[in-house]
């Protein structure tokens, strides 16, 4: 059986990645692709149990290193219980946030030692790197404004959305640095455009990547 394809959606608050991943999933289902839509933190029963602790801020008093450990534990369960089995059976996995969010949120703005983060990452993903990552880029002030409009008030903001604008700006820079360092995996999407325009960009990028894989998959399946 041919291996599937693992695509992650990344970006700052209010960039619209969750809207776009749902739109892409619907479009791919309509085209009869075997698609699994998932998210982080969460995505598996074990990881979902950790999700509330992380987003509510309950883990914040223990410091960024403990928070990073919790994210890694949740990710390991998610990878082994959901993502890896789906990719191995040939599915296309669409994941709302993955390792790049930890690199940025805990590693860069959390101030955790890069070597520690790299070790955690290796343990958590155990070789399950994304084949493609879409990084949704938007000015943090606009992203936070959109996030507030989406919720209707500041009352429902999670602990990450409540952080200072300077921190959000540092995260934007960190995501763009990842994209620049790994251009073979990452595509930066201008998330400031209207949702339909962004959808067109995402659709074109993903289907181009899938079509580029098709000849290789056909060669792999051909008799020798």
Swiss-Prot record:
Q: Which cysteines are joined by disulfide bonds?
A: none
- Identify the InterPro entries for this entry: P-loop_NTPase (IPR027417), Thymidylate_kin-like_dom (IPR039430), Thymidylate_kin_CS (IPR018095), Thymidylate_kinase (IPR018094)
Where does the UniProt annotation place the signal sequence? none
One Pfam entry for this protein is: Thymidylate_kin
Q: Which reaction does it catalyse?
A: dTMP + ATP = dTDP + ADP
Family annotation (Gene3D superfamilies):
P-loop containing nucleotide triphosphate hydrolases
Select a single GO molecular function from the record's annotations and give it: dTMP kinase activity
Residues that, per the record, bind ATP: 11-18
Any one Gene Ontology cellular component term annotated for this protein: cytosol
Could you tell me the EC number(s) of this protein?
2.7.4.9
CDD domains assigned to the protein according to its UniProt record, in alphabetical order: TMPK
Q: Which domain of life is it from?
A: Bacteria
The UniProt family comment states: Belongs to the thymidylate kinase family.
> What does this gene product do?
Phosphorylation of dTMP to form dTDP in both de novo and salvage pathways of dTTP synthesis.
Which protein, by its recorded name, is this? Thymidylate kinase
Source organism of this protein record: Mesorhizobium japonicum (strain LMG 29417 / CECT 9101 / MAFF 303099) (Mesorhizobium loti (strain MAFF 303099))
């Amino acid at each position: 059986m041919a291996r599937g394809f693992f695509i992650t959606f990344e970006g700052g608050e209010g960039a619209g990645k969750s809207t776009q991943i749902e739109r892409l999933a619907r479009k791919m289902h309509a085209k009869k692709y075997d698609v699994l839509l998932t998210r982080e933190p969460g995505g598996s029963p074990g990881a979902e149990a950790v999700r509330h602790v992380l987003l509510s801020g309950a883990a914040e008093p223990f410091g960024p290193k403990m928070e990073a450990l919790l994210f890694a534990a949740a990710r390991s369960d998610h990878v082994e219980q959901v993502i890896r089995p789906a990719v191995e059976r040939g599915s296309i996995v669409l994941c709302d946030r993955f390792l790049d969010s930890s690199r940025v949120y805990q590693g860069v703005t959390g101030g955790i030692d890069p070597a520690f983060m790299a070790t955690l990452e290796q343990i958590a993903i155990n070789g399950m790197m994304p084949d493609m990552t879409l990084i949704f880029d938007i000015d943090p002030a606009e992203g936070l404004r959109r996030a507030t409009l989406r919720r209707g008030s500041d009352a429902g903001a999670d602990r990450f959305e409540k952080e200072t604008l300077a921190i959000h700006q540092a995260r934007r820079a960190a995501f763009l640095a990842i994209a620049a360092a790994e251009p073979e995996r990452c595509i930066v999407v201008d998330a400031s455009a209207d949702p339909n325009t962004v959808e067109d960009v995402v659709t074109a990028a993903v289907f181009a990547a899938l079509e580029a894989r098709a000849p290789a998959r056909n060669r792999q399946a051909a008799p020798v």
